[in-house]
Amino acid sequence: MKQIIIIGCGVVGAAIAYELSLNPEFRVTVIDQAAAGQGATAAALGVGMAVISHKVKGRNWRLREASLRRYQSLIPELETLTGQAIQHNTQGILSLCFDAEDLPRWRSLQEIRQRQGYRLEIWQPEVVGDRCPHLNIDQVAAAIYSPQDFQISPSELTQALVAGARANGVELHFSQPVVGFDRADAAPESAEDGRICSAVHTATQSLATDAIVISAGLGTLPLTQTLHQPVAVGPVLGQALRIHLDTSLGQPDFQPVVNGQDIHLVPLGSGDYWVGATVEFPPETSPDTALAMQPEAERLEAVLAGAVAYCPAIAQGTITQRWSGLRPRPQGQAAPVI
């Protein structure tokens, strides 16, 4: 049986652990410096953009399509195994288009997706107003509706993945930062430099391993530097507000995720909504510098103002939660790094 150690238990590490736990050939151990899902996972809205993405071929599209298909079975699979409900929205994504010059590109994507077996609908402004009366369509040239895309709570998904992995025999060690590795000689074809990792050390234990998976987000660079195979990962800022309204926006039976000017409006049920966006930092920005650059009030007010511009009704809501957090993004290569 092959021993695999996964370093990092956000949504990515937890998903890898769960999927590997389905294979009896592997014995899986997960290590995290904190609790599950406390890093970048807590700074994500979980909007799954596959069909509506302009990626139409190559690795990026294959991964998006495979994920889209897997989630259809994964969510009920986890809920049945763990008894935990996972908040998710299967009513699609509606992306507002404010520039008519972008429409030929959307029509081209629509044709490609149709050939691939997926639906994309291009709505005229009056259709948007009819289906989503809470949206301000004054500046809207059209909207693209993707009924097969979805949204899922990253935190709830992570907890369910952890519970499912544990039920399948995965060992989990939390609050244990990795402090070092043992490396051993290997056949040249086994590793880039002819050496492999044979053990992982924390402050309290050493764990032998046949392979490691690093899913440590912004902790990736220092870990890979220790292994003499550095992978540059830089920060982007995820930020959001949770807003409560006395009644649901628009039609209660049609609550898609809405995207306008790269600001997401995510329905959570019972009159609750996330409003969130991602802020890009300059490529040379270090995580420490990025953390110091988080003027939450100023940046969050800009996000809220952007959302109010296309959905005025949320200005009447009560802000019940605010957060900002850093998410990893590879530098100098395409995401994800596999």
Please name every model-derived segment.
Residues 5, 15-24, 33, 44-52, ...:
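Active-site substrate-recognition segment that forms the wall
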Residues 24-29, 171:
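A generic structural motif
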Residues 32, 124-125, 174-176, 182, ...:
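Short loop/edge segments at beta-strand edges and connector loops
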Residues 143-189, 194-203, 207:
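Helical element adjacent to the flavin cofactor pocket in flavoenzyme catalytic cores
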